[in-house]
UniProtKB/Swiss-Prot annotation:
One GO cellular component term noted in the UniProt record for this chain: cytoplasm
Iron-sulfur recorded as keyword: no
Gene, per the UniProt record: tsf
A molecular function GO annotation: translation elongation factor activity
PROSITE patterns: EF_TS_1 (PS01126), EF_TS_2 (PS01127)
Protein name: Elongation factor Ts
Primary role: Associates with the EF-Tu.GDP complex and induces the exchange of GDP to GTP. It remains bound to the aminoacyl-tRNA.EF-Tu.GTP complex up to the GTP hydrolysis stage on the ribosome.
One Pfam family matching this protein: EF_TS
Localisation per UniProt entry: Cytoplasm
Keywords carried by this UniProt record: Cytoplasm, Elongation factor, Protein biosynthesis
Source organism of the structure: Mycobacterium avium (strain 104)
Signal peptide: none
């Protein structure tokens, strides 16, 4: 008996863009496990699967203040443009900065005047007639640089980056951190260093590289070198410090940070509509 339904097939198809039969077979092979099904589709050559699987259906905005970054969702971009919605986001991120809330539940309980964040969201939701959701929050205690990016001039920021860093206290420290924030916004780094990549992710990428190389008919004796090359390509794409700098493609982000005497300790990137 299959451990998935027609609705599961539809969901996987929406996430990946793969064909219905391919999705059905991938779910069957993975016993209904979505992550394994996505991996199976990638092995079979659906090259855009990983990126499409990150997408979610949501509108809204990101906001930053102090060491805090939030994502507040709405159902439509019409509401995202609403002045009251944007004002609420400003109040919520201010509450996040002052309360240092570590997660959404803690932030929902934080105060905005005489009410809570959760109550304020519910009240505006009832007034506007659209579901609103506080999707996520991040807070860093150290020295931070924030960057917000708009997809269109008439829309609020949809991409937000928060970078925590250490330097020598020079003005150039902030400039270097800002350049890194722009880099993260543009190239979507997922990890700071290679050591931060979870072992299961590395194992999955290695397995995908090996299986795709075999499917391409590569010589058996050449597989180890090919797999390592593709794995290094993954690190170059996903790891911030190993990415080529957008400002100087001949140097990595790590090289430019070393030259500036700045150390990035952590970062977070939120994008409306993505996981």
């Amino acid at each position: 008996m299959a451990n998935f339904t027609a609705a599961d097939v539809k969901r996987l198809r929406e996430l990946t863009g793969a064909g219905m039969l391919d999705c059905k077979n991938a779910l069957a092979e993975s016993d209904g496990d979505f992550d394994k099904a996505v991996e199976a589709l990638r092995i079979k050559g659906a090259k855009d699967v990983g990126k499409r699987a990150e997408r979610a259906t949501a509108e809204g905005l990101v906001a930053a203040q102090g060491g805090a970054l939030i994502e507040l969702n709405s159902e439509t971009d019409f509401v995202a443009k609403n002045a009251e919605f944007q004002a609420l986001a400003d109040q919520i991120v201010a509450a996040a900065a002052s309360s240092k809330a570590a997660d959404v539940d803690a932030l929902k309980a934080a105060k905005i005047g005489d009410t809570t964040v959760e109550q304020a969201i519910a009240e505006l939701s009832a007034k506007i007639g659209e579901k609103l959701e506080l999707r996520r929050v991040a807070h860093f205690d150290g020295t931070v640089e924030a960057y917000l990016h708009r997809r269109a001039a008439d829309l609020p920021p949809a991409v937000g980056v928060l970078v925590e860093y250490q330097g020598s206290g020079k003005d150039s420290d902030k400039e270097a951190a800002h350049a890194v924030a722009l880099q993260i916004a543009a190239l979507k780094a997922r990890y700071l260093s290679r050591d931060d990549v979870p072992e299961d992710v590395v194992a999955s990428e290695r397995r995908i590289a090996e299986e795709t190389a075999k499917a391409e008919g590569k010589p058996e004796q050449a597989l180890p070198k090919i797999v390592e090359g593709r794995l290094n390509g993954f690190f170059k794409d996903a790891v911030l410090l190993e990415q080529p700098s957008v400002s100087d493609s001949k140097k990595t982000v790590k090289a430019l940070l070393d030259e500036a005497g700045v150390t990035v300790t952590r970062f977070v990137r939120f994008e409306v509509g993505q996981a």
